């Protein structure tokens, strides 16, 4: 196997290796790195794994890495893909998709200062099938296939050493690109998550190429053209025109023309560059394509056609504003007062032309921008130049001359950038200008002048005319660039070359007596006047700058050497074809004008060009009509946009498989074959096809799995494996989880394992352990599966059971039960435990992967509620510090302490009012809204630093205070006697208050039952009939998608801009209980106060405050009478006129929400307002879930680091581990490894710990994280402690090292140490390694006693074994010496165990034996435990099946399953109930076959909250909602028996399987019945169908997913001997 295919020197190399086991490794050897990294792609979930451990996934060479992967044998390699670069990776459902570049073209080989720009010549998608059976729709599979068909080759480029997303030379390093031009940002995230961001290149779309030019065979200069396409408005010709909600324009390209003179190594390089833009007109417009030969009809938006135009020019102004960068002294440039942006509009402006409307609006947009006052230092100027009309009337040459005339003034004013690259930074003292030094280059850049401003060209599509005009504009600049570099293009001078001078002057012929020479050091030219015997750097006769702008076409042609012009024209021709192909699917038209300077422009060529243009026109029309929508989808998916629409079930972050080695079984798994191993092959992916045969006498099989890392367990993945008879598979499974083996809790009981084909993957969702009390009070145990489907929670889960979340789970016990009473051996297949592991590596180092976890660690745990970031406990309160732009009045502040304020400390009323309003008044400025994502340009996570004084931490709040406040809310709505039935909106607002108070559903039900109220009576899901609820749910779902799209657009729009101002009205604007309109200036009066008896009016922060103008009815409305911004989105698709009729949502991609647009509640239909409140409640439910995740994450950190977490965490930007700790570790380890570091190692059992001690996990945390004064100690009452340490992996252990506590040891607390080793939890099988008395170490090493001296290496005691022992568990027993056992107890009075003031765990001294004044008992203590040795490479024993076992598995089944014919089947209740009617003489039914469902679980179920900082960054989300509360389905089977009564005979908890998988469920016993009923129960509402392209918001279809329909999905069967039933019956096997 040749690692390096023929044809290459040492360069970046990537090899994608697929082994016969199905495992995929990516071996990457970067040019910038001396070593090789191996990235493992998990074959189950597709997640990337990399630890950076030498010898495991970091090697010296590519060959060494491959030898390790293949065990030195190439026979196990299934396939290999050789590549030159990694372009991206994504896990898309059942596939991992790796994009690599297999062939590169060095399009710009050597930029000034180094760096090669590569164009992707050939690319390949490596499609990796995954074992995870996540349900995936057919549409998703189709979209994934379309993604792989995206045209990448020849149209994308990158540089792996320099930032080229900004004008040359960039001031930023490679890994800080400009996001506007990065096209694979989403695809690069997985590599950033594993700490290898540089392994995925930064990919740009567009064109990059260079041309050398010279004369007489000599190289004079190099011109390079780079065109960067913006991703702010990606898409195809008729789907991405004009401006969008991201303030980006369609087909927007930044072009850069770079010219330099190549020099020898060590010499400075002079260069200059010119930037221009091209793109469609930045207003809201489009074109409707007719299916005829006529032109498309152009239209401009009726409302706000210039919205976003100002932001577009702001982005340009910010990028090209270089007024303050030019050197203030010694340069020719004057100080610039403003930034010019010149728009050259090439559209047809003649009367009657279709493009005339665009010209008019373009001119009007200029007036709009100037009147806005938002660009005070920018001058936007429009030049209208009808290109086609000029060519038709005047011809091509005069058209070019006219363009030059218009461009002369702006081109000269904007100028170009000039500078030098200095190979040595020692020469910077001679630099006169801006100095750019970055780590990516060795030398430095010195820029003498900067281009200030930009010229922007456009036509209708920014294609053909734009390319031609930009060429002729760029040509004039190119000539001037050459002049300033000393390259003469004048024909009368020949093709001479004169060196650059400091003044940038052009070089003409030298006068008599003058001579030019080159400086030997810098390479610069200087001039000698032999007449006066003087020298100068400046040319004695500088030429006139920009002189060709005044020339006529023929004069230009005669006076200019045309070969460089031809080279430049060739670059523009290629560029034009690339951009035209990306935008229209065809090459550029009307390109023949670019060859006007050549001699081949005759009549025949003009005729050929006309034929070519006609052909391209027909190609464009076909592709735009038939292919554009597919290409648009491809681009969006490639960019990671609208994934909730195209790939709705794809998770943000795949789960980890934590059971795989180094996970292992704590007990050997019993097996019928004596030659088999201990069961480790059941956890190894290398034996995916294993069939494990358990002993025949086993009633149950119980497996104890120790996970490779602590995690929260989410799923159990079982691979069904059996012989010829599938009856050997287990029928049910129980799962228990816990941190230690003694505290396991039941999470799943009796989950069904159906019979299915060999090799089928079944997924069992695992919730956290649920309290039996919570299950009882919510009715989940008694009522969940008995309730009617009509009362299913369609809107949201009203009775959500909250399982415990624990990120330190380490032990999983899986118990399998056989089927039936007949004892036959069970067969097991591979077992995998999937979960979410906290990014410990990112926490322990300075990497970004710590993400949200590091934020939680540094955030004080002030409140368990996720809604504590606003001072009135309202996370959704809109910002009141801003004023409306329409009609507004000053905000009057109310009394911040109203008389009826509730006492949050006691939960009691602070006034005499018996039923006060549960509303805490807040007078605060904005910025505390957790859900104001539509009000900010960049949404940032809000910490709890704004928690007000009135809020109380959850753990300090009286137990019933939240329930008391909740009941007060209920009484304020239903009256003191609870006589009033709550309406839908009231019930929803009550739920909002419940979630604000951070009360769980179980706590709510417990409070309601305490006053005799059935929780079901206030369930909003049953407030309306099912038909209306279904419609409401559909609209809320559409709103969620539009809200997600709006957030996406908001984040993208913030690229290149400052933060935008907030909106006063938020996305929902839900009025709280007791709030309402008090009249005043409000003319709408939609939310009139209906204050119940006994409550005061709470009108708000703005009863006389801001007033807004409704854009529909044009009435003034107060804040309470305005609908949320989400209503604006829905109003465009679901108006009041269509509330009872049509109404569809053809494109759920969000149009922008204007900050100056408002809509009152009277102009919205009631169902739209109700959809807003439904979405609001869903968001709050999600926030509660994320709050629980945060609390669980914080608890895990406390358990590992203790209460003073921030002292233990690595500081961002500082190297970790520090050098001192690293040197100490290397010193005591030598050539051995540390085998017991958390999180890979942990404790098997709990270790007794004192209350003021560091956590016992701190004994194993990485050494560099150990606080200098913190240490672990046992309770004083414990005279011995046993710690069982499970090592990182199977290892050869040679010693145990005990780091001494800062207080040191004395004879009183120096323990005796006993150490055992074993490979499982069987204590009888462990081996004693030795017994040591620490007192003897103290006597021989006195430095072990007394306080630790600062600045010294940590004190330690090494317990060395006589011989290394291979084991997985080390048992350590520490025992205090018995009192009186030693007569030589002499305690140093200066020793104080806890006398260090810095110790966060010991505020007071505690032992007289160490110098304290109070006599206390000694205790066991230690600083850290290190287990040293060498890891044993995982060599899973291959289970060799004996001949008898193989014969047993191959035996044919005695009974087969046969189909029971039916009279009829009747679907009912939205197809969630299916009744099967059997024929009178049917055989006894033994079970049923269920074909797995096709419905999906969407990731987006509500509008996003503001804690989503970056939709591409999974580190901002620790755990998705779908795993916090997993959706579980059940199927209930009932039969009709005597007295015509349906009797339930069985209920099955369904696993997840791929669509269409045949699942066979046996009944508990065979049944004889005329009718069998099947009912689907559980979290039915969590599943949906794939979104359609057009969503009918008012349809009366079933509110449940059609993919869950039981119709034609269930078959009954019976068992029979195939030889007894006959040949014909055998054909009916099921």
From Swiss-Prot:
Residues 508-542 form the WW domain. It comes from the Eukaryota. Coiled coil: none annotated. Disruption phenotype: Characteristics of a constitutive stress response, including dwarfism, closed stomata, and accumulation of anthocyanin and reactive-oxygen species. Accumulates elevated levels of PtdIns(4,5)P(2) and Ins(1,4,5)P(3) in roots. Hypersensitivity to salt stress. Late flowering, shorter roots with less lateral branching and low fertility. Abnormalities of cell wall and membrane structures in primary root cells. Residues 147-527 form the SAC domain. A motif (Phosphatase catalytic core) lies at residues 456-467. Keywords: Hydrolase. Ubiquitous. Most abundant in the roots with lower expression levels throughout the leaves and shoot. The keyword Cell wall biogenesis/degradation does not apply. One of its GO terms (molecular function) is phosphatase activity. Gene3D superfamilies: 2.20.70.10. Its EC number is 3.1.3.-. Probable phosphoinositide phosphatase that could be involved in stress signaling. The phosphatase catalytic core motif (or RXNCXDCLDRTN motif) from the SAC domain is found in metal-independent protein phosphatases and inositol polyphosphate phosphatases. This is Probable phosphoinositide phosphatase SAC9. It comes from Arabidopsis thaliana. The gene is SAC9.
